Amino acid sequence: MYLHRAPRRLTIMSIALSLALPALAQQAPPSLAAGAAVKAAPVDDKTIQKVEVKGAASSYDARRDDTASKIVLNHDEIIKYGDTNVLDVLKRLPGVTVSGASGRGGEIRMRGLGSGYTQILVNGERAPAGFSMDSLAPDSIERIEVIRAATAEYSTQSIAGTINIVLKKAITKAQRELKVGMAGGKGIINPNYNLQMSDRKGQLSYSLTVNGFHNRFDRDTPSVDEGYDVAGKPVLYRATVFQEKGGYDGVNIGPRLNWTFANGDTLTSQSFINAGRFKRDAQSDEMTSIGARPPYPSLDWKVTNENYFFRTDLNWVKKLEAGAKLDLKIGGVIGALRNDSWRDAYLVRGGRHLLDSYVKTRGTDKGYSSTGKYSTPLFEGHALSVGWDGGYSQRDDSRKQNEAELFAPDDKLYPTYRPINVNEDYKGEITRLAAYAQDEWNVTPRWSVYAGVRWEGINTAVRGSDFADSKSRSSVWSPLLQTLYKLPDTKGDQVRFAITRTYKAPNVQQLIPRRFTSTNNSPTEPDYQGNPALKPELALGFDASYEHYWGEGAMVSVSASIRKIDGYTRQGIVLAPDGRWIQLPVNDGTATTRGVEFEAKFPLKSIMKNAPAIDLRANFARNWSSVDAVEGPNNRLDQQTPFSSTLGVDYKLGQLITGASYSFRTGGPVRVSDRQGIYQSARRDLEMYALWKFDPKNQLRVGLNNVLAQDFISESSYRSDNGIVKSRSVSPGVVMLRATMEMKF
């Protein structure tokens, strides 16, 4: 087995800012599912959060010039390290972290918060349930926008912030490019390809992007369960060997057509097709040396999963008199999910077959949407826009679980297991409507103000075969204010301030009282069940920042933020009347989160005239939070990442471009409730890349990921009147080598 060692701590000197501000509270609407969230307005054209007078287009910088704070990562930065997974790109962005072990997916977090606090959009909209961000290839992305403070044009379900991933669109010249790559490490092999084609013929332009990948893995995840009574005496020790192998195949297709008419109007058709197939074979063997044994120490799993997603939009932009513009968009989406899971149980590996279990899940998503925005200069110095966002979404799910105990264990040391047989169906519908108005006012050449208000209303209806029907109707008003002031007698110094009202609505899985069972049920391996009484969370936020720009590509910024959250949701664990442990979401009072961030990036030539072509970048984020209903210390909100940092360097020498990035995030213990606890190890990632240009049409990109090969350790614990139980697992780190040949033709 392994030893649990505390990682070394990193000492960082940073500027500490703190704000203490009051909070507001208001009922906010529940949401049906991640895929049915409020849809944002189009993102293809410039939004009104831009200063109206910017000078030459070549000098425009969204980070510097937009009144509403936003960080934009362009396509060249996205593909720099040769990543095949968009999550690996996001973890290098300032103030963004991805939880979990490197290369195993994870949750995207801003300000150290995930679980719905960070809003993730694709082309301004949330994808439906079943769509995996892991399947989105970086080559298909045009840009990534990190929006720290909410704006009225997007849904305000963004307490921590919004990350908007904008897919590629047509360009003005013909282009054909093929990329063929291979990535591999211990037990992992990932071949992939990307084809991009675009051209223009008269008033019509088109583009087509195709990405494909074939990922295979073979890995172990060992774990240990320990228990102690109130006197500290060991009452449980169980070691588990978990082995799994399988793969994931996927393809993404993105066609786009654009017509430009003589009067300047445009009509755009854009679609996105995603298909993926996952397969996994796994086995686990539990060896108990102290305490009670589980019902079935040896288990075999086989899982297959297929998901399909198709979205299409038609966007018409009409230019009107006096600089006004009308932007209309309609869209439709369909998706399907097929999941099959087989589970066989034994007392010992190779022994008598005791339990046979099969779970069949089927799901479909469909919906349509409509958005519109009218924008006009209105008065001198003002950029006003009003708009709407409406739609309908439907989710149908069926789940059948059939279990048969073939033989009961003869040994009385093994607890009795009751086979579970269920046949469940549910249908969820959501009808939504949002309206907003926003204005950006250039008060003076140095001072601009953004003000907006958004109303969102949502009606939900959920029906199921094993729970009572439920309906809800709710709405929320979100007033928003942001301002940018460029300090006098300076060329590049400016300050920002923002006040936002945002919220977090529960998703459909959190609301439906349908139970998902575990085989060896315990406080650290509970069943899961939704809570129909769950309420949304509402937050009042304040952001402030100082920025200094002193040359092309050179800047430094310091920012601070605070969020006061009412109706905080945590995961509780209860013992049901049938004797099984159940985890379910519950509202538990208020919570507060504060944070400071520091970012700097600059070419070395900006401070040393004759320096080589080296670009440097660094960012640090420190977060604090507390949940009022949970006694400290370590009563952090949503397992918040306390500290994260990234250091990077890029160097160009002739035909060679190379660089490296080092990321660090702390972990540590978290008190979820007076009885529950969680621990995660600190995480260190070192990545390197090199790009060699053979000629203008051919180049080779090589990258190394997770060079330090650090293991990821996580632990959960539950304390009762009889003592404490802990479960600790290790995800081994793997160094990944990537090579991609890029060819234009």
Positions of predicted regions on the chain:
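Short acidic/polar hinge/loop motifs at secondary-structure boundaries
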Residues: 98, 109, 125-150
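Surface-exposed extracellular loop regions of Gram-negative outer-membrane beta-barrel proteins
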Residues: 336, 459, 471, 485-541, ...
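Outer-membrane beta-barrel signature, preferentially recognizing the C-terminal barrel domain
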Residues: 301, 305-309, 424-431, 501-557, ...
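Conserved C-terminal beta-signal and adjacent last beta-strands/turns
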Residues: 2, 497, 540, 605, ...
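N-terminal periplasmic accessory domains that precede
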Residues: 86-89, 106-109, 146, 158-180, ...
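Extracytoplasmic beta-strand/coil segments of soluble accessory domains associated
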Residues: 87-125
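Gram-negative outer-membrane beta-barrel transporters
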Residues: 444, 449, 555-569, 582-670
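N-terminal periplasmic "start-of-domain" segments of outer-membrane beta-barrel proteins
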Residues: 50-81, 106-109, 115-118, 171
